[in-house]
Regions:
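Membrane interfacial helix-start motif at the N-side
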Residues: 1-10, 14-36
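Transmembrane helix recognition focused on a "late"/terminal membrane span
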Residues: 2-12, 38-138
Length: 138
């Protein structure tokens, strides 16, 4: 019995779009993946921070979700830059098919770098603004 074939482009896309909730981990490893569940815990944790610290800056309220998405962007790059041979050995050993990456994956990785680096740099800048000036610059 052959297993389903795991698509590297789809896994990278899930990591970029829904990675903050662990969708890529659940696609690759199943519904009980511990790191996927850790990603999923970012949403209730964000809700708890919002409920407990209502007077806090919105950046701090969204920080668990921001961290989860930054990690997911990194995972999208790792997934997308894995060679097809290593990908098939790790995820498609019993599927009977081989993977072949195309230009869609390359565009997705470029977009991931653009968005991921922007989010990371903006988060670091806002964090230092809040910690050192109390939010005086915005």
């Amino acid at each position: 019995m052959s297993k389903t074939h795991k698509n590297k482009t789809l896994a990278s896309f899930l990591a970029v779009v829904l990675g903050g909730f662990g969708a890529h981990r659940f696609y690759l490893k199943g519904p009980l993946d511990r790191l996927g569940l850790l990603h999923l815990c970012a949403l209730p944790l964000t809700g708890m921070v919002y409920g407990i610290a209502q007077e806090a800056d919105p950046f701090f309220k969204l920080l668990p979700l921001i961290v989860s998405y930054v990690v997911a962007f990194l995972e999208a790059l790792i997934i997308g830059l894995t060679s097809d041979e290593k990908w098939d050995a790790a995820h498609n050993a019993a599927s009977g098919r081989t993977s072949k990456s195309n230009w869609v994956l390359a565009l997705l990785l470029v977009a991931t770098m653009l968005v991921g680096c922007t989010v990371l740099i903006a988060s670091i800048a806002r964090l230092f603004d809040l910690l050192y000036t109390g939010g005086a610059y915005g």
